[in-house]
Amino acid sequence: MDDNIEIKREDQTSHALVPDKDRKSRIQHGGKRPIDPFAAEDDDEEEERGDAVDEQDQDDDEDDDEDDDDDDDDEDDDEDDEEDDTARGQRRRAKKQRRNRFLDVEAEVDDDEEDLDEEEEELAREDGFIEEDIPDDTEDVQRRAAADNQRLDRFRRQEEDTNAEALAEELRQRYGRSARYAAQSDYAEVPQRLLMPSVEDPSLWGVPCKPGRERDIVMTLVRKAMAENFTSSPMRIISAFCRDSIPGRVYVEARRADDVVKACNGLAGAYARQTTSLHLIPISEMADLLKLQKVQNEIQVGGWVRIKRGKYAGDLAQVLDVSENGEEVGLKMIPRIDLNPKDSGLYTDSLGRKRKKGAGSSATTVAFRPPQRFFNPEEVQKAYPRDTPTKRGSQWVFQNDSYRDGYLEKDVRVTGIITENVNPTLDEITKFAGESSIEDGINKLGAVDLSLIADASKKATEALIQPKDQVEIFEGEQAGVYGTVKAINNEVITIQLEHEDLMDQIVEVPARSVRKRFKPGDHIKVMSGKHADETGLVVKVEDNVTTFLSDLSMQEVSVFSKDIRQAAEVGSGVNVISGYELHNLVQLDAQTVGIIFNIERESFKVLDQTGQVVTVKPHQISTKKDTSRAFALDHDGNEIRAGDMVKEVAGPFSRLRQGQVLHIYQSMVVFLHNREYTENGGVFIARARSLEPLAPKSVSTKTKKDGGDLSKMNPALSNLSGGGANDVRVEGVRRFGGRDMHKGKNVAIIKGPYKTYRGRITETTGNMARIELTSVSKPITVSLDWLVEKDPITGRSTKLNAGGFGGPSRGGHSGTGSRMGGASSNPYSSGSTSMGAGGRYNPYGGSQPAAAVGSYGGSSGTGAGGYGGYSQPVATSAAGASGYGGTGGIGARTPAYNPYAGDGGKTPAYNPYGDGGKTPAYNPLGDGGKTPAYNAAADGGRTPGYNPYAGDGW
């Protein structure tokens, strides 16, 4: 059909029926519909409407057979019309057919449509799409059901409206305030400004405390405040906190400083005894104390870190890998395995003695941890027979730890490692290069990325670079260019280039791209590290490692270039520790002595008399030995002393070693030094009998050496003396003539700032003396005029004379005679030779600083003398008096001695004319320097001595 048929009912508007397939769908979905309570008013009316619908449906079926080829646009129009009809509340009902309540009569559908599956059918049944069986009840029941449905729908609509209003009100109350602030944010201040402290807020006080106890003090304050909160006198503090970056300080918030002092009273480690010990934090700095700025340290594979705690605390480790979440890192370190499990309850102290661990000690603490040692499965298996290591591929597993190539590989959390200021030393780096010694590991440092070390110690490197340093750019576009540092601004360094093509140009480069530059022949000084303050000559430069020849030990030392700088002076390094110097002979124990050949920061390298090298601490040394007067006999029977150049002529090193004598021990062992030998700092030992001088001693050499001995020029002494024996004696006296006679005296200070202090003279220089005080253990330097000698037993004070060898006594001056031990017979002689102790007393020339020898100028001597001594002959300890004073030299001696024989220098032979310098020989002409020799003519300087002509005050 080409024309549309309009059917208009009384209760609805006009509706166009389209003769297409849409009508079938309407019949399908309208076959059974839910009961409409408003449409059940009149049965007849419903039947009439149903008949009209049926008739119309039959007409539509006929139209469908004829118009199967109509366009789809008509179908869309019909759907719109259907929606309009539904919106107006118009419903069509099919003619009600009689149904049996016990039979399930399905709706009649087209064959073209697919059957609904069970799930869709159930869903449609729940939605009311398929009408269920309705019992044939009365109309009242249906009307009541319809009314109930209406009320239920009305109640649901009211409930939905109410819930929406309540929800809107709740949201308005919750977010209304922030919305107002958000609306005002364009013209109002930042809200965070309201949280800043002001003068009306409580003050913040800094409390000093013991470093390391900050957290304990804060927790104690919190517990104390909670305990006293409900008492009659609660703590009046508001808060307490500490910062890990500020050690030794705890911050307490309170209104008054007295409240802080009261709160901290009784806390161990808190130093808040009074308000003056507190520090008031300014208001502008209060907020900064609560800011937390997390520093992200990027951990690079191959970098260096240190362990924070546990058995490996402080040990250097190399990063192998980093986990994906960045919380754990794989480390490579040198293991610490206890190979003495039986001694697990013991530890070794600094003296090498075993001690028991305390009750609270642990085997993993730093004090009792085993030493670093590379993993050796054989040694571990011997130490732990029940817990042997197992091999898995290239790894060894022992006690749940993995070991590869002798190193321990372990996963550690990032919080347990130190990534800043690691500063690995060259000794530690060489161990990770695959060798345990520095000499062998230096050549393999190529396996270690030393640039990572520079990155790890970046701040230290920048601090060590100073203006005028020679530097080199080693990375970037300008790599290989060098110059002089002109200025440093934070992390930027200004360099004046000295390159051939870029002479005098100024460039700025990052500090991390610059390193110090040295060339062979430069004289450098070590600024930090194990060899600090040591100087030397650069012999080799390889990347970041510089090798120099030490001025102190004459050995090659390798250090990082960042730790050294150029120096003009020749330093001695750490040459003195606790009073011990290089090449000192020290006593280690009752049977062992040794010579120091290397000085480290806190220890010495000592070569003992058996040839063994030991490392000792200063407190392990008993004393320092003085061998300046020691001598020994060489291979030919000649004397050798310290300073002689000798060579070995016997033994395994015959004709191979030579050197200078440093020390002689027990006249048998000789310590020698040769700068050409690198082993043990050039120090070695030898037997005295296996040595001989490099230049053999001849008669002419001896004569030339002893040419200054004036005793050989005296014909009387040379004719009457015994010869060679006296030569040795005279030489011995001359050797002892230059000693410091004040050294070792107990003195008291009578002037100056140290008045009344007592001490002991250690050395004198001119008129100044160096005193070691006994009360404060402090060395000072004072004048000899400010000192008096104190008797340590009686406490008697004696004036200390600056000249001569002894202190003055009553009536004369003390001292020796001539330098050869004999006294001059000239009564008017006023002094001795320049080699003697000083001049003699001359009655016509005034007092002299040395002893007087002769008849006049009374010296306080004891012997009898016709001119200067007693007139009464007195027999002293050896002989009687002669007619002219002095001893006759023969009295009461056994056996008898020829007074004119040439017995000079012999003992017990006594010659009155040739006994000068002998002890206890007595010679009236040469006893000036003998003790207890008594000579009336040469008794000056003896105490007690009495001379009636010397004005001795008695």
Swiss-Prot record:
Annotated GO MF terms: chromatin-protein adaptor activity; mRNA binding; transcription elongation factor activity
GO BP, one annotated term: transcription elongation-coupled chromatin remodeling
Biased composition (Acidic residues): 39-85, 105-125
Species whose genome carries this gene: Mycosarcoma maydis
Biased composition (Polar residues): 823-834
Bias (Gly residues) ranges: 803-820
Source domain of life: Eukaryota
Domain KOW, residue spans: 520-545
UniProt family annotation: Belongs to the SPT5 family.
Bias (Basic and acidic residues) ranges: 1-25
Descriptive protein name: Transcription elongation factor SPT5
Stretch list, region Disordered: 1-125, 696-723, 797-834, 933-954
Compartments, record wording: Nucleus
Described purpose of this protein according to its UniProt entry: The SPT4-SPT5 complex mediates both activation and inhibition of transcription elongation, and plays a role in pre-mRNA processing. This complex seems to be important for the stability of the RNA polymerase II elongation machinery on the chromatin template but not for the inherent ability of this machinery to translocate down the gene.
Comp. bias (Basic residues): 89-100
Subunit structure and binding partners: Component of the SPT4-SPT5 complex. Interacts with RNA polymerase II.
